[in-house]
Amino acid sequence: MIKRLFDLFFSFFGLILLTPLFILIALWIKLDSKGSIFFRQERVGLEGVIFKIHKFRTMESSSENQVRLTIGNDSRITKSGQFLRKYKIDELPQLIDVLIGKMSLVGPRPEVKEFIKEYPLEIKDKILSVRPGITDMASIIMVNENEVLEKYKDPMKAYIDIVLPIKQKHYLDYINNHNIWLDLKIIFLTFKKIFTR
């Protein structure tokens, strides 16, 4: 209950405060390339319910339906998208998802269905027992995930075999130990990581 009130408060006032920035970003995206302002993609949320996540579009619109993994300096990424991705600004519209109850500020990142299928059953059920988050400890530790995957001959296999198990460990650690102070710590560490890259 406290966590949900925390999410509601910060997502509501965050969206109000960030509205001018959102307008500027929307204009930049539209001027930079053809297509929509937002990128919507199906993700698996609380109790396995599918929802469409909100992100600022960072790739050519013709590539949107193909996106599962983005590796290194992907040629599909727009000029505005490079900046938005570097500072994780493309994730800010997920405050909408937090406000409507599909996500939380902090929690396991929501995956696409094909990667959820790779989760061991006992792990999957536990991870899907909480709302997915905009940020978490795995996102902080693996902030350069795309660059790491670029080094592998088969990035998709590397993601499933190497990256996912690491993420799952951090997801479970969070679920087993989460409290409001841990959420505040993760939010602080997220900003610190973004602005010291």
Regions found by a protein language model. Name each.
Residues 128-197:
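C-terminal terminal-structure detector
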Residues 23-27, 41-42, 116, 123-129, ...:
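Intrinsically disordered, low-complexity boundary segments flanking structured domains
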Residues 72-132, 136:
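A short, structured surface patch at a secondary-structure boundary
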Residues 11, 39, 78-82, 114, ...:
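Positions in alpha-helical segments
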